[in-house]
């Protein structure tokens, strides 16, 4: 399970990080066709045919897939900037992801699809509220699965060698899906990066984890709600979802709480006075760690291994927190009470990179200096805070960077 979780997370990182395209698609000037670029694109498609045939894709399927696809999409690579959940502070992301309207819509969907969700829950052990939250965040309950033709999008990215061979392989997987008859070429649509349908699965994820839950002979994550919901749940189950634990718990800490002991069993946190904000008791056991995404003055969470399962779907902390908190709200849980540090200064990308480099120089950080907050940086910040006798909340701030740079 851990190997699969690491592999899924690695694939998400490739899609969620900033563009390092090795070769940019040429954009035609003043709307005129770029004949050289188009010819190169067609040559790329022709060169793909033998590999597609080796995977069992027929000439008829190949030709149908690329019918009308004669040029790269000039807008695709322009969109390979960081995804919104990385660029915005978590509290801004949550405003849209866990809105009052979305909560109401989700509860309505839960009532309408109660029978289907019960069957999926029984089969996979993944709570309906988690499945609905993913469905909401990924495609607004199926309403926004994407309108970009997948074959052209993947061909554009593959021909430009964006992310090396990743999108070439995804393109071949998309052709395999068409060969198997799950969807017609003209209906295979999704995001600019090839994430498809209501689940926003990449083709490789679709081939491994998509489910024909409604029994019509097609794994249809574009038009079948049952297939989409069951595919989300089945994927989470395969990634290692623990049916006995939540993703995490919004909690309050007692005064004088020792943040240096941030990883422990849930029973230990209970003994130390940690309480859920909904008034329910924490489970009797289970590994958990404190997560303070806005620092020690903001909301506090105890997160479990299921939080990492959510992050395997999308590596953003903001995304994972949105899915988890939305699931809680759909189930009737309370809103977060503690205020977010909305007026406090934040580190920009350059500041985060400087912090990463400074912590790496002290052998505290082992990740890339990519300017992104995440578990590795959070852990490194905590180690530095503990070493320096600071409040060990794992939160990267300008003050922390100043403290670090003042101690060469």
State where each predicted segment sits:
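Sec-dependent signal peptide recognition
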Residues: 2-10
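Sec/Tat signal peptide C-region and signal peptidase I cleavage site
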Residues: 17-21
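Short, solvent-exposed loop/turn and secondary-structure capping segments
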Residues: 24, 77, 144-149, 188-189
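Short acidic, glycine/serine/threonine-rich helix-capping segments at coil-helix boundaries
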Residues: 347-352, 357-404
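Export/targeting segments at the very N-terminus of extracytoplasmic proteins
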Residues: 42-61, 101-136, 147, 156-167
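Acidic helix-start/capping segments at beta-turn-to-alpha-helix junctions
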Residues: 60-87, 135-139, 149-152, 250-255, ...
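Signal peptide-directed extracytoplasmic domains
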Residues: 68-113, 119
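Extracytoplasmic and endomembrane cell-envelope/extracellular-matrix remodeling and assembly machinery
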Residues: 31-70, 78-83, 158-194, 198-357, ...
């Amino acid at each position: 399970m851990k190997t699969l979780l690491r592999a899924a997370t690695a694939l998400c990182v490739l899609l969620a990080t900033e563009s390092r395209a090795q070769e940019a698609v040429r954009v035609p000037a003043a709307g005129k066709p770029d004949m050289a670029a188009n010819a190169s694109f067609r040559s790329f498609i022709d060169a793909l045919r033998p590999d597609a045939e080796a995977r069992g894709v027929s000439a008829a399927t190949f030709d149908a897939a690329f019918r009308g696809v004669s040029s790269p999409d000039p807008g695709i690579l322009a969109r390979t900037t960081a995804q919104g959940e990385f660029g915005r502070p978590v509290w801004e992301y949550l405003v849209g992801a866990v809105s009052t309207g979305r909560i109401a819509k989700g509860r309505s969907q839960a009532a309408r699809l109660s029978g289907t969700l019960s069957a999926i829950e029984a089969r996979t052990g993944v709570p309906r509220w988690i499945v609905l939250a993913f469905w909401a965040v990924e495609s607004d309950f199926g309403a926004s699965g994407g309108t970009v033709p997948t074959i052209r999008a993947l061909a554009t990215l593959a021909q430009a060698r964006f992310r090396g061979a990743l999108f070439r392989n995804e393109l071949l997987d998309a052709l395999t899906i068409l060969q198997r008859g799950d969807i017609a070429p003209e209906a295979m649509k999704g995001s600019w990066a090839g994430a498809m349908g209501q689940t926003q699965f990449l083709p490789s994820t679709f081939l491994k984890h998509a489910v024909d839950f409604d029994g019509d002979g097609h794994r249809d994550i574009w038009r079948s709600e049952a297939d989409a919901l069951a595919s989300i749940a089945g994927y989470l189950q395969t990634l290692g979802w623990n049916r006995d634990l939540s993703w995490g718990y919004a909690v309050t800490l007692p005064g004088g709480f020792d943040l240096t002991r941030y990883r422990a069993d849930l029973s230990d946190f209970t003994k130390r006075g940690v309480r859920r904000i909904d008034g329910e008791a924490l489970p009797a056991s289970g590994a958990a760690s404190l997560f303070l995404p806005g620092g020690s003055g903001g909301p506090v969470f105890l997160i479990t291994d299921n939080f990492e399962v959510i992050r395997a779907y999308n590596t953003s902390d903001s995304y994972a927190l949105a899915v988890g908190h939305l699931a809680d709200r759909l189930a009737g849980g309370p809103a977060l009470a503690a205020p977010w540090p909305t007026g406090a200064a934040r580190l920009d990308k350059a500041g985060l990179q400087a912090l990463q480099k400074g912590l790496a120089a002290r052998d505290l950080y082992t990740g890339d200096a990519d300017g992104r907050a995440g578990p590795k940086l959070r852990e490194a910040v905590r180690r530095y805070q503990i070493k320096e006798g600071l409040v060990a909340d794992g939160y990267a701030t300008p003050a922390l960077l100043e403290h670090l740079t003042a101690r060469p």
